[in-house]
Regions:
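Glycine-rich phosphate-binding segment of PLP-dependent enzymes
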Residues: 1-51
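PLP-dependent aspartate aminotransferase-fold enzymes
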Residues: 29-168
Length: 168
């Protein structure tokens, strides 16, 4: 409609979500004061604050992915190993590409509807929540099969599969 086109043609106020703000500065100062206070100093030089859980999981996945490349490429400490990921059964970490690779709760839907999923389908190892034995077995399997574990993502809320269940 003409009215929508006219409204869209005008300058729009947009949030600049990529710029730091004073809330982030306050959080950074509070973290720096609290973290490491028993050791005499905070061991971290910087903190990264993000706008959502999805952004934080995407970034964590990207960092793990970058580290995995360094370790599994030729010449790396784990060169040639197959890459695996660990998550809890029923866990949800997001719908964007890297988080969905760790999301067991939506795995079936992705496998049925996404062509790209067939390249990642067998990379996720899932463990029942609270299962120390399952976790030990996952790492034993990784050693026995010469797998490289990229990362282990935990879903402390289980909001998609089992809302209200907290993982201690």
């Amino acid at each position: 409609p003409e009215s929508v086109i006219a409204a869209m043609a005008k300058p729009q106020v947009m949030a600049n979500i990529m710029s730091p703000n004073f809330s982030q500065l306050r959080v950074s100062k509070a973290l720096r004061a609290e973290i490491g206070h028993t050791r005499g100093a905070c061991p971290y030089s910087r903190f990264l604050t993000l706008n959502s859980g999805s952004e934080s999981v995407s970034l964590a996945g990207r960092i793990a992915d970058t580290n995995t490349k360094l370790h599994t490429d030729p010449g790396g400490r784990h060169a040639g190993k197959r890459v695996k990921r660990i998550a809890m059964k029923g866990a949800f970490h997001g719908r964007t590409e890297l988080p969905c690779l760790y999301s067991d709760s939506s795995k079936k839907a992705y496998a049925e509807n996404l062509a790209s999923w067939k390249h990642h389908e067998n990379q996720l190892i899932t463990i029942e929540p609270y299962s120390i034995e399952g976790l030990k077995q996952a790492f034993a399997d990784a050693d026995a099969n010469v797998w490289y574990t990229e990362a282990m993502f935990l879903d402390p809320v289980m909001g998609e599969r089992d809302p209200g269940r907290a993982v201690p």
